[in-house]
Amino acid sequence: MGKTECWYIIDCPDDAKLVVGHNAKSQEELSDMIHEGRWDEFIRYVPIKKGDFIQIDPGTVHAITSGCMILETQQNSDITYRVYDYDRLTNGKPRELHVDKSIDVITVQAKSTEDSVMDTNNLPQNKWNKLIECEYYKVYKLVLDGELEFEQSHPFLNMSVLDGEGTVNGQRIKLSLIHI
């Protein structure tokens, strides 16, 4: 059980990190760390930079940190289990946590940090570079210099322009990010 998703880092501070995974070595240690609130010991932070890509498999503890702008693609799912919420309040009240359900679905041991983040900054130009293909979606990155024509052969396509300008189906598109 869980939700498959991925994040493309559009922008982030120079020293940015995301929560991806945890440091528990066994199911028992996972449960102990969570129930005892040993968050600094439990949570695994992964350094990131603009242009990084992260595939987040079901059962992976994950969270976006302050100042990070991401593009998220995910499996259609109504389920989110929150194991920790940094003691934030919504309308003066803590948000609902799902501690026991989270413990049941979190993968032990977590994927290694090295296997979590892909640098997409130096991919070939004018080529569809596949970042991930899974049961729920395919994600490509296209760095375009010049023109490219392609035929849309899939029933659904979502294209996101992250930087620059161009023309898509006769529509002029220009984008400049506000850096955060």
Give names to the regions the model predicted.
Residues 60-63:
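Short, charged beta-turn/beta-strand-edge "cap" motif at the junction between a beta-strand
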Residues 178-180:
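Conserved small/polar residues in nucleotide/adenosyl-binding loops
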Residues 1-50, 65-165, 169-172:
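Active-site region of the double-stranded beta-helix
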